[in-house]
Each structure stands twice: as C-alpha cells, then as structure tokens.
C-alpha cells in the first residue's frame, strides 16, 4: 500500500533548513507510529509504503504535522501519455463512481504535453458511462489524479490529520497535570505545537487520582507521535499538611505556587524550557489576573497557558475530541482545598507564607514516583 502524506501548510512556509528539519521529525514520528514500512520525501509531500494489512494506518490521523493523507494507486511511468492515465483511471475509479454523481480533480507538477484541465475532462468522459452524472460543484463522490513529473497517483479518499507541528520540533515543556478536564487539553495543544510534554502530577487523591491520570495519559500517548511520556507523581498530601499552617484564603494560590516551584526544578532536571498549565482566565478564583500574577511571580521559566481564552464549553468539546473527557469527568476536584479562596491575594502575604513554610522543592521532586508511558 502506498500513501501520500501532506504535511501541515505552515511547514511549507518555513525556511528550507527548518522545513527539512520539520519534515525529518515528522517522518521519524510516522515511523514510530506505523512500526514498519518505507518513507521518503518528495516535492513537499511524504510517501509511505507499507504492507496492505498494516492496522496502524488509521493512527496517522493523530500524528501532529499531518494535514491529510490518502491511500493511492500509481503509474510509475506513463511516458507523458494521457491515454495511459485515462485507462488507469477507469481501472481504479469505475466502481467508485458507479451509479453516483461525480467529479474529477487533477493537478500536476512538472512539464507535460497536456494540462490539468485536459486530464479532468478526458478522465471525466471515460468515467461518465459508469456514473449517474457529473457535478463539479456538489458531487456525491470526488476522484483525484495527482501527476508528479513521470508518476501519476490516483485516489478517492482524503483523510484529515490534526495539522500542527511534529512533536519534538519545539523542545520540552513541564505540564502541571491535575487530571481534570483542562490539563489534558492543554497538554494536547502543546503537543500540537511541537512540544514534548514532561508530566508533573501532584497526587491529592491517592490510588483513584493516580489511576485516572494514567488512563488520560494513555489516551494522550496516542497523539504523541511515538514519543514516550514521562510522568512525575508528587505526594501532594505532604504539601497540604504544610499548607494547613497558613490562612485558608491564601491556600489555593499557595498550592499552585508550590506546584510552579517544583515544576521549575523539574525544568532544570529534564532540560525543559517552559511550564504549561491548563489555567483559563477567570474560570475559578485562583485564575484571576491578580492571582495568576502572584502564582508565577519570580518563576524563571515562561508559563504557557494554551487555554487562557477558552470557556469551559470549548474546553470540554476539545476534551471529547481528544478522548480524555470520559476519564476527566470521573475525577473529583482535588485542588479545591479552601472554600474561602480570595480572587485577589496579596503578593507580600504569599511571599511571607512561602518563607515561613520553607518547603524543600528539590526534595519534593526527588521523592516523586517516575513512570514512563
């Protein structure tokens, strides 16, 4: 089976050097997902040759960096002969257009003694007797012929990919992963921009919390382009005991700040260059503009919040698409540790609390459980 893979449009806009790098990473990710076969680059697309019974082909729809892909039939050399293309088109498409209203779409790369319009017209005439008619604007079925120099490719399916950039081209980011609805979606969005997530989870709910986090990450692993996901599980109950020493109104923001501080240490350890969270502006009390400012104050790495402008319905819709929603919805809210959380905490108070708590963030990270998924 031969498959033509069309990379995301933005990859084509990169400089030649960056484009080669992105396409090389995409090819490696595809190899990791498909497990076998031959892959090569040619004139802005990738070709993948695999066994006909390969069951991993559908996984291409979850490989970031792919705009679309199509299983194709081909004539490897037709000597600039349009008649060969017409005959092959009848062989491939006669059953596809049978009893249906159809259209032919053709495009060419290279020099030929015929135009793309010639191909569409002649192939359309040859297929017409098998069909119920032609409609270029609203066909029941479309058939495609793509001519690249001395090879013609025939296909009738265009399967959409997730677009974005190949996972790995943007380096690593440490993701604060609660396991609720938001953090898996934020992780997915960072992978879509080419980042490899390093997962940091503060376990506040014991074995139940751990179970659902692992299930969510198993879903996200299918979108990772073959990259393994490394999970660091911190014992969050020890942190909560510490936080009981400060005023209730500051505890939620202080907990988030502890998470940021541990994430900062993990960035150092994992050679990650950013921290990612699932925070959305003004969604809850800890996510007001003021509280986000206090939470990230003094953190040396950039904080990415891919959901910052999303409302809850939009986030839920994405979670359903990704496949994590069914697990996230079963997980209790563990970060709601205070019913008196303020929407505007004082930076001076939080910094004083932080000094008094004197948490050893390095030790918190050292005592974490590490799992590779």
From Swiss-Prot:
Q: Which Pfam families match?
A: ThiI, ThiI_fer, THUMP
Name the enzyme group at the top EC level: transferase
Q: Name one GO cellular component term.
A: cytosol
Q: Name one GO biological process term.
A: tRNA 4-thiouridine biosynthesis
InterPro entries from the entry? Answer: Rossmann-like_a/b/a_fold, ThiI_AANH, ThiI_fer, ThiI_N, THUMP_dom, THUMP_ThiI, tRNA_STrfase, tRNA_sulfurtransferase_ThiI
Q: Which cysteines are joined by disulfide bonds?
A: none
Annotated binding of ATP, by residue: 176-177, 201-202, 256, 278, 287
CDD domains given in the database record: PPase_ThiI, THUMP_ThiI
Record-listed E.C. numbers: 2.8.1.4
Q: Which GO terms describe its molecular function?
A: ATP binding; CCA tRNA nucleotidyltransferase activity; tRNA binding; tRNA-uracil-4 sulfurtransferase activity
Q: Where in the cell is it found?
A: Cytoplasm
Keyword list (alphabetical) reads: ATP-binding, Cytoplasm, Nucleotide-binding, RNA-binding, Thiamine biosynthesis, Transferase, tRNA-binding
Similarity field:
Belongs to the ThiI family.
Q: Which NCBIfam families does this chain map to? A: tRNA uracil 4-sulfurtransferase ThiI (TIGR00342)
In UniProt terms, what function does this protein have?
A: Catalyzes the ATP-dependent transfer of a sulfur to tRNA to produce 4-thiouridine in position 8 of tRNAs, which functions as a near-UV photosensor. Also catalyzes the transfer of sulfur to the sulfur carrier protein ThiS, forming ThiS-thiocarboxylate. This is a step in the synthesis of thiazole, in the thiamine biosynthesis pathway. The sulfur is donated as persulfide by IscS.
* Name under which the protein is recorded: Probable tRNA sulfurtransferase
